[in-house]
Amino acid sequence: MLDKAMIEMMAQGIWDTCYMTLVSTFFGYVIGLPLGIALTLTDENGITPNRAIYRVLDIIINVTRSVPFLILLIAVMPLTKLLVGKSYGSTATIVPLTLAAAPLVGRMVESSLKEVPAGVIEAALSMGAKTGTIVRKV
């Protein structure tokens, strides 16, 4: 049933899956965390409201999240080839996986930060806290 070649193929498949998942998750958080913070800050109830920036980021996230992954995979093939050098394989799959994960992470960060009570943020502002301090510590 499971000969040596089959076990090696399964081990390679497990390694490739872990590699793609971990690397794309890392880059998804690297992109999604600042995206979520920017969404929270520029919201109309945020610390630095900016309707134009918020709308642009919001539209990008909503559009990216609504595109099925297979279509996203095909649509970003030229970008993948530009960044990785080829459009197939486990390393090339990281690009569309990251682009699919980042908006999800950004939206989760935004919703988590919006749960911070407004009174706590107002208290920090009244004590002279800067925006960066509020984002990091409050």
Provide a role label for each language-model segment.
Residues 1-8, 45-53, 133-137:
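Short, membrane-interfacial amphipathic segments enriched in basic
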Residues 12, 16-20, 65, 69-104:
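Loop-to-helix entry region at the N-terminal start of transmembrane alpha-helices
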